[in-house]
C-alpha cells in the first residue's frame, strides 16, 4: 500500500503538461478508482484538482453513482491523464437529445378501484425527472391535500433565474439545475435570452413529462379546445423532483446528466424518469455511456430507472438506452385522435390529423402546389428560403416530412405567402401521423395519401384543395398501434437482451406546458397554453415512470427488476379490436422488436403472480459474460469485481423477463441453446403453474420442468428453456428473427408471459 501511494505521489508531483497548446480544450469525464486516493488529501476534490494548473478547469466532481470528475482539457491532456494508475476510463463529454389526459384511462386506471386505489395514487413515492426543468405554477403541480414531504427526502430546491425555494411545495419537493457542462461546452455559456439559469423550464418538455408521470387532476384541461377533459398523471399523488439537465437549443450533456444521477441518488428518489438518449452516444458500450453508468448506480441502490427508446424508428436496431438495468420504453397510440382531412377538387377526402386552432378554412378551396415537382428536394421539404413566393402565394403547399421540424415548415410556407400546408409522410414514416399545433391551416397525411395528393396536383390542370378540421374523436380503433417513430430492436449492444422492454402511450399526449414558449416551441409562436399535446417516446417513458411509482407504493419491498418484470409479463398483445398489435409504419402485424413484451397493462401488473428478480451480482455476471474484464466493469459498478474463471457465463442467462436465443451466422445445421430462468412467486403462497409454449416458426422449444410448484416454504423455482433450430432451413424473414413465447398459467387469474426471440447475428 505504501509503495502504491509513493507511485501515485510521484505521478502527481509532475505538473500537468499540455502537449499541444493549439488544441481546442473540451470537456472530458474521468472515471477514477476512488479507493486509490492518497491519504494526504482531505477530499477527492483536492486530489483531482492537483492534476490541473487551475481548479476552475474542473466541471463536476462525482461521488455517489460514479467516482470521478469532469474537466475542460485538451485531447492530449486527456490522453496523458489516461495513463494515471488510478484512472479507470476517460471519455469525451457528449451531447444527448430529448426524445420528443386520456392515457391513464387507456392504461386501465380507474378511480376508487384497482392500482390507483391499492397504491393511494402513488402517494409519497418520489419521481426524479431528468429533463428541461419544470414550470411550477401549473395546476398539475398543486399540493392541495397532499401530506407532508416524506422524511427520508434529502434534496433541495435551488434558487436561480425566476425560481426560488418558494416555487417548491409538497408536490414539487426538489428542483436542481445542472449547467456547468453546458457552460463549459458552449461559447458564451447558456443563452439567457431564451433560457433560465435555474430549474425553471424554458422548453416545455420537462413540464410535460413531469405532469405525465405524476400530475394532479386538472379539470377543464385542453390544448386550444383539443383533448378537453380532466388532465392527470399516472401517479397523481407521487412527489416530483426536477433535475434540469437539458437546455433549450443546446441539448443535454453527459457530464451534467451524470451529476444529476449523483444528486438524485443522494437526495433519495425512488424512480428516475429520463426521456433522453441518442445523440453522440447511441452506440457506446455500457462502460462509456454515462446514462448506463449512472442508471446502474441508481438501480444498485433500489431506484427504478425508466428511459425512452428513441424516435429513430421504424428502422431496425434504432432503439437506444440498452442497458439491462434500465427499463426501455417504446411509444404507441391511444384511442384518441384529432382528424383533419385534405379535401381535393376531384371530390376525394384523404385522412389526416392536426391541432390547428386558428381560423378554419370553412370549406373554401385554394390552389394546391407541390414544390418538389421541379425535383428540388430542399423545396419539397419546405426548407428555409427554398420556396418561390410567386409559385406558392395564395396556395396550399404540399411539403414532405423530414430534415426540419414539422411546424417550422408551415412557417416557411407562411413567409412565402402560402395559405395552408399539407404535410406528407415519406415511406419511412408510412401512415404514422402526429398532430401539431400549426401556425397556419395545416394537416399531416400518411405516405399513401401524400402520394395521391401529389399525383392529383401534378396531373390536374387546376388542382385545388381544402382542409377540414374535425376536432377531437375518442374510441378510435385500432389502438394501441406501435408508433412509426418508436425505436426498434434488436439490441445493438447485447442482442440477448430484448429491447425495447415494452411500449406505452406516446402519441398525441396532453400534459402541462411552460409559459416560456408557445405550443410549437418556435420563437415566432406568441401563443400561451397551459397544456400541450406532444408525441414521442419521451411521452411514453413517464407513463412507465408513473406506473413504477404506483407499483412501488403498492409493493414497497419490490426491487426495480421485480417492478419491471411485473409490467413486462402482464402486457397486452392485442388492440381494442382484439387483434394483434399493428406496426403503424407498415400496417402489418408488429413483432417483439417493435413492442418488446407488449403494451403496458397496469390492471394486471399490480398482481403478476410470478416475477423475475435480478440482483447486482447478476448484472456483474452478465457484464462478465459479454467480455468485460474486472477493471472495465468497475467503471460501471464503482467497486472491484471478480469474473468467473472456470466457465464463462452466458449473457442469455440473465434472469430477464424475455428470452432471446442468438446463434452465430457461421453456425450451420442443427443448433440448440439452453437458458435458465428463476421465477419468484408473489401471488398466493400455494400455487402450481404450467407452461404453454408458442414455438417460433421452424424452431423447437422445450421447457423443463413444465410444471412449477410453489409453497409457503418454496417461493422460487428455476426452469430451463431449450431452443433448437436448423439454421439451414429456418426462414428469419425481414426482421432477421422469428418469435414465440413461453407462458405460465396457474389456472386462475395469473398469466405470466415471456417473449422468445430466435435470431442469427454476430455480437460485437
Swiss-Prot record:
InterPro entries: PA_dom_sf, PA_domain, Peptidase_S8/S53_dom, Peptidase_S8/S53_dom_sf, Peptidase_S8_Ser-AS, Peptidase_S8_subtilisin-rel, Peptidases_S8_3, S8pro/Inhibitor_I9. Residues 103-606 form the Peptidase S8 domain. One of its GO terms (molecular function) is serine-type peptidase activity. Glycans are attached at residues 191, 578. Residues 46-99 form the Inhibitor I9 domain. Expressed in roots, leaves and flowers of mature plants. Residues 1-20 form the signal peptide. Its EC number is 3.4.21.-. The active site is at residues 131, 205, 538. GO terms for cellular component: plasma membrane. It is an enzyme of class 3 (hydrolase). It holds the Pfam family Inhibitor_I9. GO terms for biological process: plant-type cell wall modification; proteolysis. Keywords: Glycoprotein, Hydrolase, Protease, Serine protease, Signal. Induction: By methyl jasmonate. Belongs to the peptidase S8 family. This is Subtilisin-like protease SBT1.6. It comes from Arabidopsis thaliana (Mouse-ear cress). The lineage of its organism: Eukaryota, Viridiplantae, Streptophyta, Embryophyta, Tracheophyta.
